[in-house]
Design a protein with these regions (language model features):
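"…together with the soluble PPM/PP2C metallo-phosphatase catalytic core" -> "…together
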Residues: 1-185
């Protein structure tokens, strides 16, 4: 099935980004699961998140350029040196992940926000011919929307830190290598 369509038709570079994103998502899930089971203090969680973010950055999941419309209208995006790319990527991945985790306090809020963001990412990804990002965002949107049915008030199931870390990281990672204005990678 993998080679008959979908991800099997993507370029090997995109395949690497997909696997790196999914490996990072699994690692973030495991950090969150460990927090759910053992009530980790914030510093070990943050250290683990930064380590995983650095690892996926080394595999190509990175913010390589920043587009400032008021500054780069004619010049295009500003390419970041590796040190700034690493810093921007780590702040983005860890920041979005923790933002989604903070939203998980109310029934349906984290999954609803992440689902809406993923649907928007699907639309933008496919309109820019970013098929790999579109497929991953569509899968994430489907997960969120399927979960929401059981997570509305009164919630019957809960995402926990593992689920919210997975959602946040996957959303942030797909956005970091997925749709970029004017690109057709």
């Amino acid at each position: 099935v993998w080679s008959m369509g979908g991800f099997g038709l993507l370029a090997p570079a995109k395949d690497q980004l997909i696997w790196s994103t999914l490996a990072g998502s699994l690692c973030f899930f495991l950090i969150g699961l460990a927090d759910d089971l053992f009530a980790l203090s914030p510093w070990p969680r943050l250290a683990g998140q930064v380590a995983v973010a650095c690892a996926v950055w080394s595999q190509g999941v990175r913010i390589g350029a920043i587009d400032l419309p008021w500054f780069t209208a004619s010049a295009g995006p500003i390419a970041l040196p590796d040190s700034l790319s690493l810093l921007a990527t780590v702040v983005w991945l860890v920041g979005i992940t923790n933002a989604i985790n903070w939203l998980d306090g109310l029934d349906g809020l984290a999954a609803g926000v992440a689902g809406i963001a993923a649907v928007g990412l699907v639309s933008v990804s496919f309109s820019l011919h970013q098929v790999a990002a579109g497929f991953l965002a569509a899968a994430l949107a489907g997960c969120c929307l399927g979960f929401l049915r059981h997570n509305f008030n009164p919630a019957r199931i809960f995402m926990g830190d593992g689920g919210s870390y997975f959602l946040g990281f996957t959303l942030a990672a797909v956005r970091s290598w997925g749709p970029q204005r004017g690109s057709r990678r």
